[in-house]
């Protein structure tokens, strides 16, 4: 097979030689005949079989013998034979020019063969004729067995040019030939008969009758030769079509005789696939020359319809264009151009000429053969191509290397890029339609189908909870949710289930990363519940006992990408929520769905193949921003009351609990019925490879969190009262939270801060509600006639983001410090409530011991500013002694005085910044103050270690327990820093001592001074972003209109104007008193808070100032060994550290005992029988010991 024919040609459009009138032209197998080209006649005729159909009058045509013309003869004469009757199959055949090859009787010849046969070189003319004669003598392997119509016979008329003559195209004498440039014609050219042709007559009749816009052409009569292999006449499946052609100016080539040639199909192995454009007027590829005849029996030989085609120029640099691969299939060498790109804004095709003669387009630049140049009529048809290769074909590496790389930058193949935001392809705006919906108990409740894509990969589809999302528009307060008849899916129908665990996730404006981090961790914890197949509570269907509730504080505050994440899980759908129902404002939008997929923090779907089980979800989107306390009221009073769960877990968006944290948290309630609340360990998120610890602020918080979970939480858990259960990871027993019959209880006190107004809200209560997670702790332990305790669960851990910038860190600690301080004051003032509880006497004694410890801690917190200054004053001032000065020349004295006055000025600056500036507006000043505090702390630490080392290495002083320096310094340091190391090793978690301890001790003065000062100076700020008065007033009316005119109401009569003036004069004369409006509740509340803030700051500042000045003046002239206040301070710190260490050690021992007891009970069950009753007695004894320890 010819390698050039490995694929079909890239052009497949009809030839260009005629329009609706088909004039036969030429006989060249190359399908080309120039009007002015010279060709030689082949004197060897071949036999022609005439048509056999006698139905119509046909004109048999014979070729007259030709004679060679002299060089002076301009052309050869051609004369038609006289008209005769229609020949029968028995008549002698008519001679016609022979085909090129005997084997190509199907007329499917290549252009190369045609050129060699009909345009020989002058020196090879004789040889060519000889070769043709030899080929004629050979028998044809496939004799012609097909019939041909008269029109086809006319297309085979031979021209008889003489050497030096020119071939001429037959023209209709009645047609205007203004567009055709004729050559000199011979005198004996055949003439077309007078009158209109049969084809033209039928065409005009159709136009006259108005049958169709493009009339069809009746099939020509055909004559058949008897062929046993051929079938009967098969109707054509291709509708008759007319041709339109691109207008041009001049032509030097004739049409092709192979327009009607039968097709043998393109060679196999082609991979070409065309494409169509979406715009009218773009070139299409519905027809190829090879598709003109599907078989030899077709009678439908009409032309294809007009396509507004565009072709290559007829000439190539002034010479006829050579043949192309399509010549083998009867195509034209003048190739149609490929279609324009899909989105190219090409104009409509230019209407064709009425003339049937097509001519070429002149090229002004002989080096430029591009018809789409700037001077062409087709310049706007499509973008400028880089080269002549098709857009559908890929360029070879050689072509890419040879081409100019700048050409690709000069031309835009697809036009300019669209500006502005573009809609995604295939995405449309939602089509809204009005529907009548039946209200349920007067409320709007909708069951909405989930998206098709989500439904397609769900493993479970049997229940409505998997296939439909339920939307409820809640128009009432959360306290009235159940009373107004609102229900959840877990309370009706087939999905009625008992809820064991109710998880609340509160969020404000967090992005999708924080939300998916928390939600994916929760779903993995639910999978762990279902994996405990041996549990009596959980198992494969354990997910049916867990409900996750997401409460978002404000519809306009939620992050849009978080909504997208919820929509991807099937929980949320856009366009369903409504603002009001029957003129009642919607307070919250509740979405319910049981999702089976999860999104991790990388926003990748995780499903059942990753162990994810179904999760019952409730998404409550509050209409307004009403603070986190209101979100908890929706959770506890609305949804909790409807579900009545056993345990409620509170999480914040951004917190990532570990894989088994929620199970350990629930297990604490399951094993001890007296536990009302529990919490886990909060860890700072360190980032990949702990890179977040490079930030000193993050490292110091990591150390603080670790030591709190090692020393403080275990100590308080031993006593049974944890001062704060962090809202980021805590759990409560729902039954313990309920109010008593009089309406008083933990929840009523907890939500009291949401309804405080005016002076009735004292500043202590208001600040206490800033740390709302401390409220429930005290109310649960002090609940009347109950013995609830709080527990710390070491096995429950959760990572959370910590502030990494100074302003965010200060703002967070302001709420924490004020809430902790005022909550401690509140619990100490109301400690008598413990006496009315049902706790055991031992538990009450332990609780009073804890109150004493909290009181001491509170006193140290209140005077922490003075204690820091005095510690620095005495320790750093100890180096001013000339005997101890490590630098000599009184350099230590100079450094001490500089740092001393810097410390005093810095503390004063902190008050000024805290009273009048936000941390976000004074970022640099706060950062500078923290750096100076760090320098002071580093010098104080250096002085401490220098004094200790000098004391140990001094030969004059003996080291003994009664020595003041040894007692005050060494014992104090070992009882703090040393205890930190010992307890960290005991809990097998010492790494924070290596990575974060130095940062914490350096930033310790900033914790004491910067954070404490800012917190006390902003006790009046108890708002959580409450909206101001942003409602437009309407009491004065308005001016409404369009354009330059408006409509308004105003006095129109002169009497009204005079009356108003008279009233104004009378008021001035009578001196009427104008009543002053009373101050608003918000103004009274703000004034009250600020006044309390002033009294509190003055009290705190004066107390610390008096303590610092008095102690520094009394002991300024004495040494460290004789400073009794410093001795008291250091020993108090050591005592508190030891107390915390003892409590933490007790907690660790009790945990080990519980583990041993549980293990021993399991072992005794497997003890051999010869133990007798000893086994049972040991088990009972250990169980009683365990119960006593827990109570």
Swiss-Prot record:
- What Enzyme Commission number(s) does the record list for this chain? 2.4.1.16
Q: Provide the GO MF annotations for this entry.
A: chitin synthase activity
Please list the residue ranges that the record marks as compositionally biased, kind Pro residues: 89-100
The disruption phenotype is:
Resulted in reduced mycelial growth and virulence, and increased sensitivity to various stresses. Leads to increased expression of CHS1, CHS3A, CHS4, CHS5, CHS6 and CHS7 chitin synthases.
Record-annotated membrane-spanning stretches: 816-836, 855-875, 893-913, 929-949, 968-988, 997-1017, 1095-1115, 1129-1149
Q: Where is the signal peptide?
A: none
Reaction catalyzed:
[(1->4)-N-acetyl-beta-D-glucosaminyl](n) + UDP-N-acetyl-alpha-D-glucosamine = [(1->4)-N-acetyl-beta-D-glucosaminyl](n+1) + UDP + H(+)
Bias class Basic and acidic residues marks the residues at 36-45
Q: Which residues are glycosylated?
A: 4, 108, 525
> Topology in the membrane?
Multi-pass membrane protein
Disordered: region residues? 1-172, 202-407
Induction description: Exhibits higher expression levels in hyphae than in germinating conidia.
Per the record, its GO cellular-component terms are: cell septum; plasma membrane
- Which family is annotated? Belongs to the chitin synthase family. Class II subfamily.
PANTHER family in alphabetical order: CHITIN SYNTHASE, CHITIN SYNTHASE 2
Protein name (Swiss-Prot/TrEMBL): Chitin synthase 2
Q: What is the gene name?
A: CHS2
């Amino acid at each position: 097979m010819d390698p050039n024919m490995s694929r079909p040609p890239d052009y497949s459009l009809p030839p260009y030689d005629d329009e609706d009138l088909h004039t036969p032209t030429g006989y060249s197998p190359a399908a080309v005949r120039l009007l002015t080209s010279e060709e030689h006649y082949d004197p060897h005729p071949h036999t022609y079989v005439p048509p056999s159909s006698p139905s119509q009058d046909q004109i048999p045509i014979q070729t007259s013998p030709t004679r060679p013309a002299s060089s002076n003869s301009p052309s050869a004469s051609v004369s038609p034979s006289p008209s005769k009757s229609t020949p029968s199959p028995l008549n002698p055949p008519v001679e016609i020019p022979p085909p090129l090859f005997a084997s190509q009787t199907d007329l499917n010849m290549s252009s190369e063969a045609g050129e060699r046969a009909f345009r020989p070189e002058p020196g090879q003319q004789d040889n060519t004729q000889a070769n043709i004669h030899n080929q004629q003598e050979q028998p044809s392997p496939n004799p012609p067995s097909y019939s041909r119509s008269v029109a086809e016979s006319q297309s085979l008329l031979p021209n008889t040019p003489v050497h030096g003559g020119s071939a001429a195209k037959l023209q209709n004498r009645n047609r205007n030939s203004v567009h055709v440039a004729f050559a000199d014609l011979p005198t004996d050219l055949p003439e077309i008969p007078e009158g209109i042709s049969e084809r033209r007559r039928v065409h005009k009749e159709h136009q006259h009758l108005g049958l169709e816009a493009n009339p069809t052409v009746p099939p020509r009569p055909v004559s058949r030769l008897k062929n046993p292999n051929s079938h009967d006449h098969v109707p054509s499946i291709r509708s008759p079509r007319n041709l339109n052609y691109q207008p041009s100016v001049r032509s030097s080539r004739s049409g092709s005789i192979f327009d009607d040639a039968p097709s043998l199909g393109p060679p196999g192995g082609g991979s070409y696939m065309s494409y169509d454009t979406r715009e009218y007027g773009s070139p299409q590829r519905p027809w190829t020359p090879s598709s003109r005849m599907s078989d030899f029996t077709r009678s439908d030989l009409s032309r294809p319809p007009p396509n507004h085609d565009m072709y290559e120029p007829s000439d190539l640099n002034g010479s006829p264009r050579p043949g192309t691969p399509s010549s083998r299939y009867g195509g034209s060498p003048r190739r149609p151009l490929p279609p324009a790109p899909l989105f190219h804004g090409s104009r409509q095709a230019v209407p064709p000429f009425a003339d049937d003669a097509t001519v070429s387009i002149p090229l002004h630049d002989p080096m430029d053969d591009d018809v789409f140049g700037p001077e062409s009529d087709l310049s706007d048809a499509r973008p400028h191509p880089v080269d002549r290769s098709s857009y559908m074909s890929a360029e070879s590496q050689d072509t890419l290397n040879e081409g100019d790389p700048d050409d690709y930058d000069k031309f835009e193949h697809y036009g300019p890029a669209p500006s502005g935001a573009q809609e995604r392809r295939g995405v449309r705006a939602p089509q809204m339609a009005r529907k009548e919906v039946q209200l349920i108990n007067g409320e709007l409740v909708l069951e909405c189908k989930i998206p098709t894509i989500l439904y397609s990969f769900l493993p479970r589809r049997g229940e409505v909870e998997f296939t439909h999302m339920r939307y409820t528009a809640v128009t009432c307060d959360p306290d009235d949710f159940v009373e107004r008849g609102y229900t959840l899916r877990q309370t009706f129908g087939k999905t009625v289930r008992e809820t064991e665990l109710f998880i609340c996730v509160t969020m404000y404006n967090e992005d999708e990363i924080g939300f998916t981090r928390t939600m994916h961790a929760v779903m993995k914890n639910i999978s762990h519940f279902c994996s405990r197949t041996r549990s009596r509570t959980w198992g494969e269907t354990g997910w049916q006992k867990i409900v996750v509730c997401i409460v978002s504080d404000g519809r306009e505050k939620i992050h849009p990408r978080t909504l997208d994440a919820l929509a991807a899980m099937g929980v949320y759908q856009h366009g369903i929520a409504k603002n009001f129902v029957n003129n009642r404002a919607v307070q919250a939008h509740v979405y319910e769905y049981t999702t089976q997929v999860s999104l991790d923090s990388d926003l990748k779907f995780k499903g059942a193949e990753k162990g994810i089980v179904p999760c019952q979800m409730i998404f409550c989107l509050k209409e307004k921003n009403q603070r986190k306390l209101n979100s908890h009221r929706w959770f506890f009073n609305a949804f909790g009351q409807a579900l009545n769960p056993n345990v409620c877990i509170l999480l914040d968006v951004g917190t990532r609990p570990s894989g088994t944290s929620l199970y350990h948290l629930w297990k604490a309630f399951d094993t001890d019925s007296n536990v009302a609340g529990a919490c886990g360990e909060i860890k700072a998120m360190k980032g990949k490879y702990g890179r977040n610890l490079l930030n000193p602020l993050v490292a110091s918080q990591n150390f603080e969190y670790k030591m709190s979970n090692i020393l403080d939480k275990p100590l308080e858990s031993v006593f049974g009262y944890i001062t704060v259960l962090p809202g980021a990871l805590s759990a409560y027993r729902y039954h313990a939270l309920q109010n008593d019959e009089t309406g008083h209880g933990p929840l009523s006190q907890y939500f009291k801060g949401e309804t405080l107004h005016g002076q009735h809200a004292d500043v202590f209560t208001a600040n206490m509600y800033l740390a709302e997670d401390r409220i429930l702790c005290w109310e649960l332990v002090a609940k009347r006639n109950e013995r609830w305790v709080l527990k710390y669960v070491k096995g429950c851990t959760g990572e959370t983001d910590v502030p990494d910038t100074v302003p965010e860190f200060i703002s967070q600690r302001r709420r924490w410090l004020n809430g902790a301080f005022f909550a401690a004051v509140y619990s100490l003032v109301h400690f008598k409530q413990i006496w009315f509880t049902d706790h055991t006497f031992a538990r009450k004694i332990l609780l009073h011991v804890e109150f004493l410890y909290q009181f001491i801690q509170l006193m140290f917190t209140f005077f922490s500013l003075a204690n820091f200054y005095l510690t620095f004053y005495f320790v750093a001032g100890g180096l001013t002694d000339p005997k101890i000065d490590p630098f000599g020349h009184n350099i230590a004295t100079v450094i001490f005085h500089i740092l001393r006055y810097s410390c005093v000025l810095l503390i004063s600056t902190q008050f000024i910044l805290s009273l009048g500036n936000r941390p976000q507006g004074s970022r640099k000043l706060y950062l500078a103050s923290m750096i100076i505090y760090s320098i002071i702390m580093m010098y104080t630490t250096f002085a401490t270690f220098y004094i200790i080392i000098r004391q140990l290495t001094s030969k004059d002083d003996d080291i003994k327990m009664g020595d003041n320096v040894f007692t005050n310094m060494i014992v104090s340091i070992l009882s703090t820093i040393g205890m930190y190391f010992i307890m960290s090793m005991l809990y097998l978690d010492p790494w924070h001592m290596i990575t974060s301890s130095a940062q914490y001790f350096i930033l310790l003065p900033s914790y004491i001074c910067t954070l404490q000062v800012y917190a006390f100076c902003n006790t009046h700020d108890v708002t959580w972003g409450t909206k101001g008065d942003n409602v437009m007033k309407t009491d004065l009316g308005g001016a409404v209109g369009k354009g330059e005119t408006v409509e308004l109401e105003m006095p129109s009569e002169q009497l009204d104007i005079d009356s108003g003036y008279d009233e104004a004069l009378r008021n001035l004369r009578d001196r009427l008193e104008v009543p002053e409006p009373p101050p608003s509740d918000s103004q009274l509340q703000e004034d009250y808070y600020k006044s309390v803030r002033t009294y509190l700051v003055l009290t705190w500042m004066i107390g610390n100032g008096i303590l610092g000045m008095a102690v520094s003046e009394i002991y300024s002239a004495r040494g460290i060994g004789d400073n009794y206040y410093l001795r008291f301070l250091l020993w108090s710190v050591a005592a508190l550290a030891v107390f915390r260490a003892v409590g933490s050690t007790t907690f660790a021992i009790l945990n080990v005992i519980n583990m041993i007891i549980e293990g021993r009970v399991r072992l005794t069950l497997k003890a051999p029988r010869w133990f007798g009753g000893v086994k049972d007695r040991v088990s009972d004894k250990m169980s009683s010991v365990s119960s006593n320890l827990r109570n």
